[in-house]
Amino acid sequence: MKVLWVALVITLLAGCQAEEVKPAPEPEVQLGQEWPGWQGSQPWEQALGRFWDYLRWVQTLSDQVQEELLSTQVIQELTVLMDETMKEVKAYREELEEQLGPVAQETQARVSKELQAAQARLASDMQDVRGRLAQYRSEVQAMMGHTTDELRDRLASHLRKLRKRLLRDAEDLQKRLAVYRAGALEGSERSVSAIRERLGPLVEQGRARAATVGTLASQTLRERAEAWHQKLRGRVEEMGTQARDHLEEMREQLDEVRAKVEEQGTQMRLQAEAFQARLKSWFEPLVEDMQRQWAGLVEKVQLAMATSSTSAPSENH
């Protein structure tokens, strides 16, 4: 068991040292593309995907609607999604720690510290995204009446960089949690194997003793030894069955958590669609009214120009 956790710690420390090396320049990734290579199925991974999907949906809206939403709505929605993601990460980490069982306290504390550091980096990346949108909103408000194309380009560039960093740290956390979970499952299996190894010699001793008693004693002693042997073997099988049932229960709990997250994802998607429909119903009358006012203004200007052109020759005469 200790050898397993020593190997686990070496793996995590090697990952930390690898992070200190500066990575090679990454190719540019457009915000509209999907997460490359992201195959997450855990609740926290799906929550993180919903965070970025919502941000990409906001960027597909028109300029006027987007600037109106950035006043309060988008920042609040991103905050809720960010909190949901970090909550799922924390819940998944605590669940793995419960499955870990009794191990060396120093080793468990070191591994837990590494996971908390990776979790903190992911939270910092998401806060940077939210802060960049808040800064963009302030700059847009300060430049009312001027072109905001430069600000939008700067925002897109910053979000691309933040997205790369967010993806890198999310993959790092995903790998660490996978190693952590593998260690927990392997530790449980090793515990079952250790029990079988300890009881195996006892079973063999029981068989040998039963054979010896059978040759030296009566048939009654032989039957009692055989009964003891059967009882001991039944106990070993029962302990093995309990261990397998425990592993199966753990898998069922993970499936239940995954189903709940999928249900939440469906609800959020329906809420987003309803919200989009409300936006459309709000702004379509406004746009139509502006078009009518503009058409009336153009008509008045044309009429005024026609009047001035007819009055000018009469004044010359």
Swiss-Prot record:
Keywords: Chylomicron, Endosome, Extracellular matrix, Glycoprotein, HDL, Heparin-binding, Lipid transport, Lipid-binding, Oxidation, Phosphoprotein, Repeat, Secreted, Signal, Transport, VLDL. Residues 266-317 are annotated as: Homooligomerization. APOE is an apolipoprotein, a protein associating with lipid particles, that mainly functions in lipoprotein-mediated lipid transport between organs via the plasma and interstitial fluids. APOE is a core component of plasma lipoproteins and is involved in their production, conversion and clearance. Apolipoproteins are amphipathic molecules that interact both with lipids of the lipoprotein particle core and the aqueous environment of the plasma. APOE exists as multiple glycosylated and sialylated glycoforms within cells and in plasma. The extent of glycosylation and sialylation are tissue and context specific. GO terms for cellular component: chylomicron remnant; endoplasmic reticulum; extracellular exosome; extracellular matrix; extracellular space; glutamatergic synapse; Golgi apparatus; high-density lipoprotein particle. Residues 158-168 are annotated as: LDL and other lipoprotein receptors binding. GO terms for biological process: acylglycerol homeostasis; AMPA glutamate receptor clustering; amyloid precursor protein metabolic process; cellular response to lipoprotein particle stimulus; cholesterol efflux; cholesterol homeostasis; cholesterol metabolic process; chylomicron remnant clearance. Heparin binds at residues 162-165, 229-236. This is Apolipoprotein E. Gene3D superfamilies: Apolipoprotein (1.20.120.20). Sequence repeats lie at residues 80-101, 102-123, 124-145, 146-167, 168-189, 190-211, 212-233, 234-255. It comes from Physeter macrocephalus. It comes from the Eukaryota. Belongs to the apolipoprotein A1/A4/E family. It is found in: Secreted; Secreted, Extracellular space; Secreted, Extracellular space, Extracellular matrix; Extracellular vesicle. Residues 210-290 are annotated as: Lipid-binding and lipoprotein association.
